[in-house]
From Swiss-Prot:
<dbReference type="InterPro" id="IPR044722">
    <property type="entry name" value="SecA_SF2_C"/>
</dbReference>
<dbReference type="GO" id="GO:0005829">
    <property type="term" value="C:cytosol"/>
</dbReference>
<dbReference type="InterPro" id="IPR036266">
    <property type="entry name" value="SecA_Wing/Scaffold_sf"/>
</dbReference>
<dbReference type="Pfam" id="PF07517">
    <property type="entry name" value="SecA_DEAD"/>
</dbReference>
<dbReference type="GO" id="GO:0017038">
    <property type="term" value="P:protein import"/>
</dbReference>
<feature type="binding site">
    <location>
        <position position="894"/>
    </location>
    <ligand>
        <name>Zn(2+)</name>
    </ligand>
</feature>
<protein>
    <recommendedName>
        <fullName>Protein translocase subunit SecA</fullName>
        <ecNumber>7.4.2.8</ecNumber>
    </recommendedName>
</protein>
<keyword id="KW-0811">Translocation</keyword>
<feature type="binding site">
    <location>
        <position position="87"/>
    </location>
    <ligand>
        <name>ATP</name>
    </ligand>
</feature>
<dbReference type="InterPro" id="IPR036670">
    <property type="entry name" value="SecA_X-link_sf"/>
</dbReference>
<dbReference type="Pfam" id="PF07516">
    <property type="entry name" value="SecA_SW"/>
</dbReference>
<dbReference type="GO" id="GO:0008564">
    <property type="term" value="F:protein-exporting ATPase activity"/>
</dbReference>
<feature type="binding site">
    <location>
        <position position="892"/>
    </location>
    <ligand>
        <name>Zn(2+)</name>
    </ligand>
</feature>
<dbReference type="InterPro" id="IPR000185">
    <property type="entry name" value="SecA"/>
</dbReference>
<comment type="subunit">
    <text>Monomer and homodimer. Part of the essential Sec protein translocation apparatus which comprises SecA, SecYEG and auxiliary proteins SecDF-YajC and YidC.</text>
</comment>
<keyword id="KW-1278">Translocase</keyword>
<dbReference type="Pfam" id="PF02810">
    <property type="entry name" value="SEC-C"/>
</dbReference>
């Protein structure tokens, strides 16, 4: 009560914000008369003038009033449309990192031209983001004449564009496109092989249309680029035949390797390495089978992929044993957990090892379909320097916008007072009674010539209603968000006299319903219309418009309450645009999912007390309040799910940003010589530490093991034992320095042989290729970790903390493996000339091109592992039953002994 009193005296926060912005609106209005006197050329010259002032140090805020006045005047000349004061307010809200709630029909598309123009003056690019390709193209083409009049360029970013077309779109001052496409371009840029292949500029300003749909409804579904690698099953099978002919090198009790075997096994570290004899033997076998050119080396730059396959096959044969490390069941290789002894169906070893084991066992070799890159919209849009959005319904989600994105919501007043009549909900006992009442209401509206928009929550429900209308011989149109262009036409004409349109909640969003129909579309449908034709179309429309207004305007008929109040408000907002007449009503039944799950007991108890008969409805504010409380519960639960998803994805996001930043630095750097030097010192030191522990006595040193490891992994043949025998003053530190210096000398010799420029380019290629491969494996490991992390809760551990800790360990492991693998490859590979590096790059691109990339806006349940079963209401990916359907009276499969209908069948 005290809060209400304070609001009455001082105004709400929203009122105070608008009051502050009104001062700037007054300034813009004061400039209008002067700007009207400017010639077209003088008005166009304003853009160059503003850019000069910004370059001289002026802020966007200081030129806002003049810039907005310029756009308003240009719009009057180009479109014959003048921005209302409320649209100027909306433009200012959008420029200040906030969300503008503007009702349907208030001209959001025209409002967006103001902040888009202002922020484009910086030259850093503006992204105007819509929910589908049709709206992106429509808004870009509609606003292009205005922006081009003012000297700005406009680009369109939609799926299917070539690389150059994408670059051109992003280099434009203002780029229109869909949220999915901007997100996928970001991921593709971070998978590019060279700076020239990147298309996006640094992310500066994003202006999101239908911001609630993109930042809230789609926040749980990440963008994923996945791909099945090329089918190498033939190669795995061929290489598999080479390994049985290789001989293991014997070991003496002293653990020193003796004899002339082809490979040696370090069982402690679970590693296997070729001996020099083994390398030669494998190369000869590959040449015999035509898999390697005569005189070519397995370790040459162009054969890295072949070497990878050979190593995988060797590991499969020597380190992995059937019925110990894996079992073969129904033609599939299934991993056995080394700690628990349980099988792990669905899990696969990485780096081609699983395929190599499949080849060894003679079962079908499956392609890996791995995640190549992924990001959630929550994390993508937080990368922008400035972010703003507009929608007709944001206030109910204001807390989430502020909490997750740091965006305040400002409700912008309508240009004309809202006169729509929102009637109380009617609640029936059964769905059948509800549908009969809906049909009766539609017939009543048609009798008086009032257009009706029927909103449904699913395509299934819209098809059911359509069948009922066919039965009742009611002419109607059905929309279900499948065909955007057709959709816009139907929605545009949904305001004609007596029109009946059935639409799912999201269908047709972004297109206004004009009372009497859209006369602009009728004119556009004609080829070269004459002035008389235009006048006749407009006169006919005016007659229809007046008739529809007299009949009560557009009637919105909701067939079910959505789980979010915001979606219901969007449906209602279709009527009453720009002060038009209109009405709305929701019809509910106790069989609706929201009522059944959340509001049933209280409301059905109320209905029984009132002694209702069939066909009777209850209409009372208490019922509406109970339903609203049910919706609040669902909204709170969905917010918690999105928040939990973000907390988990933030961990991956921090790692993603580190890897992508490192990758971009690598691509942009002229040389990574210093990086290689630092890595080399770390890697060689780490290997030495394993055999000569720091500050340990000489008796604990494993010198033969170190000699062999250095030779196998770094092609470094050093007589370390000989040095120690001959030089008494050689201690741990000096020995370490000598080994590192020996590697550096060997590497310098390689550099002198091939030339510094060639080696520098090769270093970058190896580093990028290794990083990409390990990052893909890391994403798969993170997926596996996420899927089971919720089970830690049963062990009284915090799943989020456990996930953070273990994912950090995985990331540390990635960095450590990256360093080791890069130095190992650079040590082993023989680069003869520039052509070797080019061939390696060409093969890499070839392999990448063979990957069938799949761009998914995929369901995100896996991102948070177990979801505590709170997804019954979410219409995401349907579950596919695996096995026979359980009958209602059958014993419950859970083993409780009760009938299915009395146990888990209750929940279905």
């Amino acid at each position: 009560m005290f809060g209400k009193l304070l609001t009455k005296v001082f105004g709400s926060r929203n009122d105070r914000t608008l009051k502050g912005l009104q001062k700037v609106v007054n300034k813009i209005n004061a400039l209008e008369a002067d700007y009207e006197k400017l010639t077209d050329e003088q008005l166009k010259a304003k853009t160059a003038e503003f850019r000069e002032r910004l370059a001289a140090g002026a802020s966007l805020e200081s030129i806002m009033a003049e810039a907005f006045a310029t756009v308003r005047e240009a719009s009057k000349r180009v479109f014959e449309m003048r921005h209302f004061d409320v649209q100027l307010l909306g433009g200012m809200v959008l420029d200040s990192n906030r969300i503008a709630e503007m009702r349907t029909g208030e001209g959001k598309t025209l409002t967006a031209t103001l902040p888009a123009y202002l922020n484009a003056l910086t030259g850093k690019g503006v992204h105007v983001i819509t929910v589908n390709d049709y709206l992106a193209r429509r808004d870009a083409e509609n606003n292009r004449p205005l922006f081009e009049f003012l000297g700005l360029t406009v680009g369109i970013n939609v799926a299917g564009l070539g690389q150059q077309a994408k670059k051109d779109a992003y280099n434009a001052d203002i780029t229109y496109g869909t949220n999915n496409e901007f997100g996928f371009d970001y991921l593709r840029d971070n998978m590019a092989f060279s700076p020239q292949e990147r298309v996006q500029r640094p992310l500066h300003y994003a202006l999101i249309d239908e911001v609630d749909s993109i930042l809230i409804d789609e926040a749980r579904t990440p963008l994923i680029i996945s791909g099945a690698a090329e089918d190498s099953s033939e190669l795995y099978i061929k290489i598999n035949t080479l390994i049985p002919s290789l001989i293991r090198q014997d070991k003496e009790d002293s653990e020193e390797y003796v004899g002339e075997g082809d490979y040696s096994i370090d069982e402690k570290a679970k590693q296997v390495h070729f001996t020099e004899r083994g390398q030669e033997k494998v190369e000869n076998l590959l040449i015999e089978r035509g898999m390697l050119a005569e005189g070519d080396s397995l370790y040459s730059a162009a054969n890295i992929s072949l070497l990878h396959h050979v190593n995988a096959a060797l590991r499969a044969h020597t380190l992995f044993e059937r019925d110990v490390d894996y079992i073969v069941q129904d033609g599939e290789v299934i991993i056995v957990d080394e700690h628990t002894g349980r099988t792990m169906p669905g899990r696969r070893w990485s780096e081609g090892l699983h395929q190599a084991v499949e080849a060894k066992e003679g079962v079908r070799i499956q392609n890996e379909n791995q995640t190549l890159a992924s990001i959630t919209f929550q994390n993508y849009f937080r990368l922008y320097e400035k972010l703003a959005g507009m929608t007709g319904t944001a206030d109910t989600e204001a807390f989430e916008f502020q909490h997750i994105y740091g965006l305040d919501t400002v409700v912008v007043p309508t240009n004309r007072p809202m006169v729509r009549k929102d009637m109380a909900d009617l609640v029936y006992l059964t769905a059948n009674e509800k549908y009969q009442a809906i049909i009766k209401d539609i017939k009543d509206c048609r009798e008086r010539g009032q257009p009706v928009l029927v909103g449904t929550v699913s395509i299934e429900q819209s098809e059911l209603l359509a069948r009922l209308m066919v039965k009742e011989k009611i002419p109607h149109q059905v929309l279900n968000a499948k065909f955007h262009e057709k959709e816009a036409e139907i929605v545009a004409q949904a305001g004609r006299t007596g029109a009946v349109t059935i639409a799912t909640n999201m269908a047709g969003r972004g297109t206004d319903i004009v009372l009497g129909g859209n006369w602009n579309m009728e004119i556009e449908a004609l080829e070269n219309p004459t002035a008389e034709q235009k006048a006749k179309i407009k006169a006919d429309w005016q007659e229809r418009h007046d008739a529809v207004v007299a009949a009560g305007g557009l009637h919105i008929l909701g067939t079910e309450r959505h789980e979010s109040r915001r979606i219901d408000n969007q449906l209602r907002g279709r009527a009453g645009r720009q002060g038009d007449a209109g009405s709305s009503r929701f019809y509910l039944s106790m069989e609706d999912s929201l009522m059944r799950i959340f509001a049933s007991d209280r409301v059905s108890g109320m209905m029984k007390k009132l002694g209702m008969e069939e066909g009777e409805a209850i209409e009372h504010p208490w019922v509406s309040r109970a339903i609203e409380n049910a919706q609040r519960k669902v909204e709170a639960r969905n917010f918690d799910i999105r928040k939990q998803l973000l907390e988990f994805d933030d961990v991956a996001n921090d790692q993603r940003q580190v890897v992508y930043a490192q990758r971009n630095e690598l691509m942009d750097a002229e040389s990574i010589e210093d990086t290689i030097k630092n890595i080399q010192d770390d890697v060689i030191s780490a290997v030495i530490d394993q055999y000569i522990p720091p500050q340990s006595v000489e008796e604990l040193w494993d010198v033969p093991g170190l000699e062999q490891r250095l030779q196998q992994e770094f092609m470094l043949k050093l007589p370390i034992q000989e040095w120690l025998d001959k030089e008494d003053d050689l201690h741990e530190e000096t020995l370490r320095e000598r080994i590192i210096t020996s590697w550096s000398d060997a590497y310098k010799a390689k550099e002198e042989m091939v030339g510094a420029p060639v080696l520098r380019q090769f270093e970058k290629a190896v580093m990028l290729q290794t990083l990409d491969g390990l990052w893909k494996e890391h994403l798969a490991a993170m997926d596996h970790l996420r899927q089971g992390i919720h089970l830690r809760g049963y062990a009284q551990k915090n799943p989020k903390q456990e996930y953070k800790r273990e994912s950090f360990e995985l990331f540390q492991q990635l960095l450590s493996t990256l360093k080791h693998d890069v130095i190992s490859v650079l040590s082993k590979v023989q680069v003869q000339a520039q052509s070797d590096v080019e061939e390696m790059e060409a093969r890499r691109r070839e392999e990448d091109a063979k990957i069938q990339r799949d761009y998914q806006h995929a369901a995100a349940e896996a991102l948070v592992g177990g979801d505590d079963g709170s997804d019954e209401m979410m219409a995401h990916t349907p579950m596919i039953r695996d096995g026979d359907k359980v009958g209602r009276n059958d014993p419950c499969p859970c083993g409780s002994g009760r009938k299915y209908k009395q146990c888990h069948g209750k929940l279905s």
